Design a protein with these regions (language model features):
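Redox-cofactor binding/interface segments in oxidoreductases and associated redox assembly factors
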Residues: 21, 56, 171-175
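Predominantly flavin-linked oxidoreductase catalytic cores and closely associated redox partners
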Residues: 118-119, 126-260
Length: 260
């Protein structure tokens, strides 16, 4: 995996074994695991700091994983099975424990004992610094091309364009859920095909419950299409002016989006 791009680029350009685009939970965890194995790794993050969404997950409690993770719960079990067999719930818990974050289980969900996302973000940042990972924030990747057996990535950083050279690139830039940016365009520019994307793990839009906006309740939700039951879940729901939110809505939202 070691890069041989020593002659690439001009002075000031940076060369790595792996460049990760995106410093969310997945990108940062990937960087830490690679660096622990001695890989020279860098991360380019568009936002002003890493792990922005991680800080908000689980209503600030930081839901790290689920004890019921199984290939059978995915639309394509055969595709995801090798990944989950190699790195499942036990491995996830062990990884966080190695960073000083013991976990506990509640209602099938894994949370840090501190019950606060801040301790997870701080542990990630501390690991990045300890392992010497090159983290560049406010750095938006704008182009990628194959170059001398690896890749050349252009990024707008601090008002200037910088080039990164890496033998391997990991795309961990997420979807277009809130950014308004086409984060998949870099991959398609390399010739990869994309499938149609729909919202998942998202509120379900509706204006039927304005009178009870802000109310939380434990409820059962059944999603139907004609006489067919598409999903049947029970959990907490949060009524909003313009949507149903909460864990119940999130668990129904994927089937809802596909049914539209």
């Amino acid at each position: 995996m070691k890069t041989d791009l020593k002659a690439a680029g001009n002075r000031g350009d940076e060369r790595y074994d792996v460049l990760i685009i995106g410093a969310g939970a997945a990108g940062t965890a990937c960087a830490i695991m690679l660096a622990q194995k001695g890989v020279r790794v860098a991360v380019s993050e568009r936002d002003a700091r890493a792990c922005v969404k991680l800080a908000a997950t689980g209503n600030g409690r930081c839901n790290l994983s689920n004890s019921a993770v199984s290939p059978a719960r995915y639309n394509d079990p055969i595709f995801v099975a090798p990944a989950l067999q190699a790195f499942g719930t036990a491995e996830t818990a062990a990884f966080f424990a190695s960073l000083g974050i013991p976990v506990r289980e509640k209602d099938g969900r894994l949370y840090p004992y501190g019950n606060n996302s801040g301790c997870v973000v701080n542990a990630f940042v501390a690991a990045v610094e300890r392992l010497g990972i090159r983290m560049t924030v406010s750095s938006e990747a704008s182009g990628i091309e194959r170059f001398r057996g690896g890749y050349r990535v252009r990024a707008a950083t601090g008002g200037e364009e910088k080039e990164f050279f890496a033998a391997n690139v990991v795309f961990a830039c997420g979807s277009n859920a809130t950014s308004g940016k086409d984060s998949l365009s870099l991959m398609t520019s390399l010739g990869y095909k994309r499938t149609a994307c729909v919202p998942a793990i998202a509120p379900i839009p509706t204006a039927l419950f304005k009178g009870v906006s802000g109310v939380r309740a434990i409820a059962r939700g059944i999603l139907t299409s004609g006489e067919e039951i598409l999903a049947d879940r029970r959990g907490e729901v949060l009524f909003r002016d313009d949507a149903l939110s909460g864990m119940l809505a999130f668990e129904l939202s994927s089937a809802y989006a596909r049914a539209l």
